């Protein structure tokens, strides 16, 4: 929690105003931030200075794992995070590759589970990683990559958190996640949860111990219409003790995650927080 608040304060104090062409808004911006989450000791990085809807973050991650490309499928899991980008993004609405309402195109999980090969067919990056780790293999390239410039025109949004690199030291699994762009007030609490949970889930289904998850942000920013509530409300609140995160121990394989797992298979214990803050979302 401290590292999150320190980053927010750093942006407020030292950030540079940058015009964002996509949203038409100014962003107070810093370059490079490194966060760490001790998954092995269940130090769950859930924000307490405002209410954080962790279930929606986990639901979105599960949708990526399943390779979903439709906002309706994400809603069924329990998150509306893709409603706006799939249906309110003017450039995407006019894109000939859009298949209709709720279609997201070839983004995130589609790339992770069905990266198109130039000679035809697809690569299931995630399955390869799970198979390797289950067999104790780390080829120094256990990388789940969502960033495919050759297909940016076929999706509603470029990936923000685009790379997840898993590493084994003995029987302990580590994760390095890289994020090119981060809406800190609105998105970072989601992203922190997802990095933590991704390592916890992958360790569980591959039979490994969870170690530390390392989360790198390149462009970390606060939009101009988010600055006042961050500076004048959230940063003036005292953080509370952190909760613990739990996963149903019956989840034992990638197939389990693909088929029967629901949000009821994840729960948080001891979460206390301040009141919610409604930050504006920029499409």
Swiss-Prot record:
(6R)-5,10-methylene-5,6,7,8-tetrahydrofolate binds at residues 183, 282. Its main location: cytoplasm. Catalyzes the reductive methylation of 2'-deoxyuridine-5'-monophosphate (dUMP) to 2'-deoxythymidine-5'-monophosphate (dTMP) while utilizing 5,10-methylenetetrahydrofolate (mTHF) as the methyl donor and reductant in the reaction, yielding dihydrofolate (DHF) as a by-product. This enzymatic reaction provides an intracellular de novo source of dTMP, an essential precursor for DNA biosynthesis. GO terms for molecular function: thymidylate synthase activity. One of its GO terms (cellular component) is cytosol. It comes from the Bacteria. One of its GO terms (biological process) is dTTP biosynthetic process. Keywords: Cytoplasm, Methyltransferase, Nucleotide biosynthesis, Transferase. The active site is at 160 (nucleophile). CDD domains: TS_Pyrimidine_HMase (cd00351). Homodimer. Its EC number is 2.1.1.45. This is Thymidylate synthase. It holds the Pfam family Thymidylat_synt. It is found in: Cytoplasm. It catalyses: dUMP + (6R)-5,10-methylene-5,6,7,8-tetrahydrofolate = 7,8-dihydrofolate + dTMP.
